[in-house]
Regions:
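Post-signal peptide N-terminal segment of secreted/secretory-pathway proteins
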Residues: 1-106
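Repeated scaffold domains used in trafficking and secretory/extracellular systems
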Residues: 1-3, 41-54, 102-113, 199-210, ...
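Short beta-strand elements that form the blades of beta-propeller/WD-repeat-like
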Residues: 6-17, 53-71, 118-127, 159-168, ...
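Beta-propeller blade signature
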Residues: 24-27, 74-87, 136-185, 234-250, ...
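Beta-propeller fold detector
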Residues: 33-43, 86-103, 186-196, 252-262, ...
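Beta-propeller domains
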Residues: 170-177, 182-252, 258-260, 264-268
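Intrinsically disordered, low-complexity segments enriched in Gly and acidic/Ser/Thr residues
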Residues: 253-345
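Hydrophobic, glycine-enriched assembly/anchoring segments
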Residues: 323-326, 330, 339-380
Length: 380
């Protein structure tokens, strides 16, 4: 993952399945050269990340030291804090995180780190019941006993163990945790029953889909990934949609909801980003929902207050787009994003005007792909 910290530094967050990865960062020197900074970070596995103050924070579900009488291990939430200026790192575990975080017995992970209104917002993603959660309080949290796994199976991010219940039993709701600071203590938990949980998915990665408008209103976007669960009891009935938390509020705006699928011709979003004001850039599926990000080759612009949705015009045909950059660069009210195609053309940077939803081709990139777009200024 390539992540720009403003216009000062570029981070290469190294993700390795199940183990540590070496993370490096870069700057521009006074001569215009990209140079690596001295410090390398060994950070543990992460499934989401974001910026809060002076830190880049990564997070994932982890095993803790807590066990029940049968040796079943409780889940927790593991954090890595990378202090950008000091080039130091530390790890922590979320207090009270993981097991029974929402009061329904399920363990959770987070999707995204959003700094807004002087607080830290993150989407809470319910993961189902661990073996520890299945056994907790004599099984009181198991709604559907036949969903408890009877043998080990799956692979990669879909692997499971005998005795756990994979996937949430509560697919028709979304939760956001609001923390007063980056210590991840004393959260305010807010719930909506108008959208399903809020995150983009690509295998084990959980992409941020909660973003603040310039006025501090937090918009919560849901692709409704629970639709693709194999058991209908774990499938959400809710379409891909948008909910809102007003700036400074401790609850969802009961009067606000937008049905993305009704406006898009039946397609959900994959992931999204804030551009400017209350404009958001949405990467849209055009071949139906999946948890691998495949077939998400359209872009749309959504304006929060007016609830307007427009597909972006001026991009290459969706059938020849193979990928977009992992996030846009915003400047002067426009979004810039890399586009890679399969028609033999070189990758290019496109400028998207949110007020018109029109894309214009800009720089051609002499490379095979474009991971991210940003701008760096010289840092001593």
């Amino acid at each position: 993952v390539w992540l720009f910290y403003g216009n000062q530094y570029l981070y290469r967050l190294q993700y390795n399945q199940g183990s540590q990865g070496v993370t490096t960062s870069y700057r521009i020197d006074p001569n215009g050269n990209v140079v690596a900074r001295p410090k390398e970070y060994n950070i543990t596995r992460f499934t989401t990340y974001g910026i809060f103050g002076e830190y880049i924070i990564t997070c994932s579900s982890v095993d803790t030291d807590t066990q029940d009488a049968e040796g079943n291990i409780a889940k927790g939430l593991g954090l890595n804090y990378l202090h950008v200026q000091n080039e130091t790192t530390r790890s922590a575990t979320v207090a009270g995180g993981g097991e029974n975080f929402l009061g329904n017995g399920e363990y959770v992970t987070f999707a995204g780190i959003l700094e807004a209104n002087g607080k830290l917002y993150t989407a809470v993603i319910p993961m189902g019941l661990s073996k520890y959660g299945v056994k907790a309080e004599n099984g009181k949290y198991v709604k559907y006993p036949d969903l408890v796994k009877t043998e080990d199976g799956g692979s990669g991010s879909g692997a499971y163990e005998k005795g756990e219940l994979q996937g949430t039993q509560y697919p028709d709701e979304a939760w956001v945790a609001i923390y007063p600071d980056d210590t991840f203590t004393n959260p305010t938990l807010v719930r909506s029953d108008r959208i399903s949980y809020a995150c983009g998915r690509n295998r084990s990665q959980y992409y941020q889909t909660i973003w603040a408008a310039d006025n501090g209103d937090v918009y919560v976007f849901s692709p409704s990934y629970a639709k693709i669960q194999s058991d209908e009891r774990q499938q959400t009935k809710l379409p891909s949609g948008v909910a809102r938390i007003r700036a400074g509020a401790a609850e969802f705006d009961a009067a606000y909801h937008f049905d993305i699928e009704a406006a898009s011709g039946g397609q959900p979003l994959f992931r999204c980003w804030h551009i400017t004001d209350d404009y958001f850039l949405l990467q849209m599926y055009n071949q139906g929902l999946n948890a691998r990000g495949e077939g998400a080759t359209k872009m749309a612009v959504f304006r929060g207050e007016s609830k307007t949705f427009k597909y972006v015009t001026g991009l290459p045909d969706p059938d020849v787009i193979s990928s977009f950059g992992s996030y846009p660069y915003n400047e002067s009210g426009a979004a810039y994003i890399g586009v890679v195609t399969t028609d033999g053309s070189q990758p290019a940077i496109y400028r998207i005007d949110p007020s018109t939803a029109v894309a214009t081709r800009g720089l051609t990139v002499n490379a095979g792909s474009v991971s991210a777009v940003g701008k760096l200024k010289s840092v001593e």
